[in-house]
């Protein structure tokens, strides 16, 4: 199973873009060359601000959604300290179903 990553890219005007991928460097290069998300095209210099492995695609999609719901301040804390990322991931883990 290929691991998935959550990443945040900072634009020249200090906005944070959140995405997921299986290859952070490849995806960052796509964004840099204008072949990534439309939201980042024409935004000037892009900087990879944060990336972390999250597990499978399903978990990555849920983590991306949750991070996109955070305030700018919370995202900045995540970038600066990784604040709460482990807790966020653990809250997204689905509990195992036990059979009798």
Curated annotation (Swiss-Prot):
One Pfam family named in its UniProt record: GIY-YIG
SUPFAM superfamilies: GIY-YIG endonuclease
CDD domains: GIY-YIG_UPF0213
Gene3D superfamilies from the UniProt entry: GIY-YIG endonuclease
Residue span(s) of domain GIY-YIG: 2-77
Family: Belongs to the UPF0213 family.
Name used for this protein in its record: UPF0213 protein YhbQ
Species whose genome carries this gene: Escherichia coli O157:H7
């Amino acid at each position: 199973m290929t691991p998935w990553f959550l990443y945040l890219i900072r634009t020249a005007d200090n906005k944070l873009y959140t995405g997921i991928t299986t290859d952070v460097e490849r995806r960052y290069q796509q964004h840099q060359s204008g072949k990534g998300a439309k939201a980042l095209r024409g935004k000037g210099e892009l900087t990879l601000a944060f990336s972390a492995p999250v597990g499978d695609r399903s978990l990555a999609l849920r983590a991306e959604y949750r991070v996109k719901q955070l305030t700018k301040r919370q995202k900045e804390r995540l970038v600066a300290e990784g604040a709460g990322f482990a807790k966020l991931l653990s809250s997204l883990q689905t509990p195992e179903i036990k059979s009798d």
